[in-house]
UniProtKB/Swiss-Prot annotation:
Listed name of the protein: Valine--tRNA ligase
Keyword Cytoplasm found: yes
Major location (coarse): cytoplasm
Pfam families cross-referenced by the UniProt entry: Anticodon_1, tRNA-synt_1, Val_tRNA-synt_C
Residues that coordinate or bind ATP: K528
PANTHER family cross-referenced by the UniProt entry: VALINE--TRNA LIGASE, CHLOROPLASTIC_MITOCHONDRIAL 2, VALYL-TRNA SYNTHETASES
CDD domains listed in its UniProt record: Anticodon_Ia_Val, ValRS_core
Induction / repression: By valine starvation. Is transcribed by itself and in an operon with folC. A GUC triplet (Val, the specifier codon) 190 nucleotides upstream of the initiator codon confers induction upon valaine starvation; replacing it with ACC (Thr) confers induction upon threonine starvation, replacing it with UAA (stop), renders the gene uninducible. Negatively regulates its own transcription; this depends on the presence of the GUC specifier codon.
Domain of life: Bacteria
Entry GO CC: cytosol
Disruption phenotype: Cells lacking this gene grow normally, suggesting there is a second functional gene with valine-tRNA synthetase activity in B.subtilis.
Function: As ValRS can inadvertently accommodate and process structurally similar amino acids such as threonine, to avoid such errors, it has a 'posttransfer' editing activity that hydrolyzes mischarged Thr-tRNA(Val) in a tRNA-dependent manner. Catalyzes the attachment of valine to tRNA(Val).
Assembly behavior: Monomer.
Amino acid sequence: METNEQTMPTKYDPAAVEKDRYDFWLKGKFFEAGSDQTKEPYSVVIPPPNVTGRLHLGHAWDTTLQDIVTRMKRMQGYDVLWLPGMDHAGIATQAKVEAKLREEGKSRYDLGREKFLEETWKWKEEYADFIRSQWAKLGLGLDYSRERFTLDEGLSKAVREVFVKLYEKGLIYRGEYIINWDPATKTALSDIEVIYKDVQGAFYHMSYPLADGSGSIEIATTRPETMLGDTAVAVHPEDERYKHLIGKTVILPIVNREIPIVGDDYVDMEFGSGAVKITPAHDPNDFELGNRHNLERILVMNEDGTMNENALQYQGMDRFECRKKLVKDLQEAGVLFKIEDHMHSVGHSERSGAVVEPYLSTQWFVRMQPLADAAIELQKKEEKVNFVPDRFEKTYLHWMENIRDWCISRQLWWGHRIPAWYHKETGELYVGLEAPEDSENWEQDTDVLDTWFSSALWPFSTMGWPDVTAEDFKRYYPTDVLVTGYDIIFFWVSRMIFQGIEFTGERPFKDVLIHGLIRDEQGRKMSKSLGNGVDPMDVIDKYGADSLRYFLATGSSPGQDLRFSYEKVESTWNFANKIWNASRFALMNMDGMTYDELDLSGEKSVADKWILTRLNETIEHVTQLADRYEFGEVGRHLYNFIWDDFCDWYIEMAKLPLYGEDEAAKKTTRSILAYVLDQTMRLLHPFMPFLTEEIWQHLPHQGESITVSQWPAVVPEHTDTEAAADMKLLVELIRSVRNIRSEVNTPMSKQVELYIKTSTDEIASRLEANRSYVERFTNPSVLKIGTDIEAVDKAMTAVVSGAEVILPLEGLINIDEEIARLQKEFDKLTKEVERVQKKLGNEGFMKKAPAHVIDEEREKEKDYVAKRDAVQKRMAELKG
């Protein structure tokens, strides 16, 4: 293909570059897996976003990392499957749809289950389209022909299969347990759906009289309304204050029920009075203790948070209204003797905002211990799941070793209905893949499964399981890497691992790449309440997808949080702009060169040899680091190579042959420009897919798209260590001359005398061989190079590798005026040094000042001393 620089506008405009490019990739089917079965498969499943609204910055970060991995692997010759999909997100989606209905003055009960689900499916379709449009704006290389949804029939079949098999193995059971209960939505919540907030509450100190009249025992609670369901008081069996009371009973105030005093190691003797009220139906720890002591479970609340018949005269009251009335009654009864202010962390429903109630409920549970044991055992084997960074394996194992049974039922309508039926007459329970044959005599359980239940099957249910003969399952499972945040290692990663082991006999993914959370510039978590959230689509509209992607990918190391910064996104835009301008310059000077005319065999300059050597080094570093998921380091290497080596040095040096008369040198330089730019665009492509595709399409190339071009490989014959050493010396020398010019305020346009005294004849000959570069970039009126250069009075000098750079100042500046100016600066800096040192020597200041203020003063001292010494050195040089 012939190049044409006129098709590359002068100005880099991300919107114009990105327009229609995604459609080009989709039409080319570049992201569809399976077209070449001879290639080694590589698979990734996207963590499915909830169909509840817009994707946030965390999604953009997570998916950008996956896109980088899959684009690179595709270019490395793998048959890549990156499977997209979305999660039905039970309670989150149902809450959104119910809120929409409320605006219309309706409730889900007005519609009925079937009609409500129809409305929810409409919501899903609308937001699924929206999410796909956001994926497109980010440039994600997803195989849409395999897109999945957690409520698809195929995935629903997998869910039923897993439920039934676990039930048949005795690993799913129905029983009473304390769960997180949302009284507003009237459903159980998973731990991740509970948000903890600091709330100003109180400790209510009460005395429970001993039944034998011999005294009383003091307890304290933050939830006095639950005392109506107390069935014991617990003390530590070794507590000398209470040992003698174990086995006795107390009278529960107001209720007048006799309850036992029990001894249990759970009680902390040092906390409060050392005696604890036990309410097995309203506290998870009390529930466990109650099981150990065979205590009665008395539920005192209804599902909506009002008090039930067990609450006696408080029946029908809201729980908080009951608290106020009960506290008043306890005070009047003389048993509540102190109310102490207490700030404590209280769980709130993420969806409704209601205070979550620990609540005894009959639910479906997964018996976790056998599944967790298998997952722990896997980590002792060679075929274990590799956590990146590996410190998260400890986090994962800690959770698995301290596992509790998993409550999987939810009192919702949107989700996978539990495949259990109850006989209308006998109450008999039937669990199966389908309803019993005489279905008219049976009623299906109205609950649905926890969203995480279906999400846990995502890596294999999306591949066709339970059909183990499905082509995708056989070819792409287990997957290669899962990319996710550390906040859901327990809720999702751990569950995928144990379900994968249980139902496929294998780990569901080989690696888990863990990233942190996105925070604002102050390090705060982004939230609606703080108003510090950032919409990734707004960032794309302003800076383009490539700038956002590059910032997200290179802004932190694995496992670390990332602070979002518009300033840093703007700097990545500047980087993209630099690439655009350099590419445009190169294309303007290629003179219509075609791919077949590329020729790297001609005689090369030291700059040519050096840039090819640096390209080899960059290819090696980038490939190795990307394979280790160290994208921050990849970004550093790419930035240094592109900005410093290619743009600032090679392109400037290439102007010598390009603007010269030697046609052979011109041809070689053009070929090297085209080749290096091509290879660099390929290295950068996974990070900045739109920009690199645009530039690559203008370069001489073969193939339809950079997306399916070959990943760069090191070419050993392109490495020239001598040329690299020569170039290193040249760069060091040129920089030192520029620095001296800057120090004495002499612009590059003004010629200077330049003497380079070398330590050996060999270094002198190397510099002589590259004299044209020294002249081009230092603009000397006189240039002398050799070992026999004599010292010059009143000159500025700099030492570089194997040589001394000397710039005589006579005639360049007015030396007397410069010395006078420097003396004033020296005096000023000396005063600053004395002032800071006096402050740091002040005992009072050192004792009272915060550590960061002292550190700032020490930094100032170092800075002033360094500047003063530099000025003193310059004066000495000028005085000769």
